Structures are given as structure tokens and as C-alpha cells.
Amino acid sequence: MKEFEHYISNIKNTDASLFQKDILLTWERSVEELKAVLNIADALKYLHSNNISTRLFESGIAVSLFRDNSTRTRFSFASASNLLGLSVQDLDEGKSQIAHGETVRETANMISFLSEVIGIRDDMYLGAGNAFMSEVGEALDLGKEEGVLNQRPALVNL
């Protein structure tokens, strides 16, 4: 248990401010914030390897949007979501109203009602994925500000 306490101490002693912040580009984060993320990952790994529950959620959805093919990332996101107690729902743009002109704002708010996190993998074209994810983040912020969403889900660049 000392190992776990070490991770928690490291997290508490960082000068990281990650609450309600998305990590879309790692180079936009401070070294302290990245250290905090790595310590959180180590703490979760410790708990899992010692058969201690890591469920943070009783229920909730983790939405995944993959705009290009992926195996490792898709299953890593699903496993991490499950580890925290979330059910994964894949968003297939071809089977949604996105294909018929629904805006990013409409889609982002619609899929966010019971979602805790939205994971997006979009790296087919340099810079385009980050621009899309930033637009989704702005739409979520606006949805929360206008009272459309009770809470804003986290946004993760996969």
C-alpha cells in the first residue's frame, strides 16, 4: 500500500490544474500536468494489479468516435472506460444525422446527455483532427453554459 500512497502523494504535490480541462495536445500541457497524469495511471495500475476496484462511476457512457481505423486504441479506450465503470458506445457517423448535415454542435450536445467522456481518434489529416476536437470542446462548453447539458463530459484525444 506504500506504493499507492506514494502515487497519491506525488499527485497531491504537483502544481497541476487539470480539473475540467481536456488534454488534446500533450505539448500544450505543463510538465507538472503530465507528471500528474502519469502518476494517476500508475495508481490505477497498482489498484488493478492488486484486485482493488477502480470503478469511479455507477453508470454512464464513454462515447468513442473513430474517424480512422484502429485496433489497439479502440480496445484500450474500451478497456479503460470499463475499468472506471463506464459503458462504451461507438458513434458511427455514417449511421447518424451527421451524414445528413447535423452540425458538430448539435451532435456534441446530443451524445453528451449521459456521457462522462468522449474519446475521438481523428488523425488522418495533419491538424484537421485537432481542429475538429477543439470545435467539439467549444460546443460542449456552450451546451453547459446554456443549460443544455447538466454536466460537460471530458474530451480525450485518442
Short names for language-model regions:
Residues 1-75:
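Positively charged, low-complexity intrinsically disordered leader regions
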Residues 55-158:
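Phosphate/diphosphate ligand-binding glycine-rich loop within oxidoreductases
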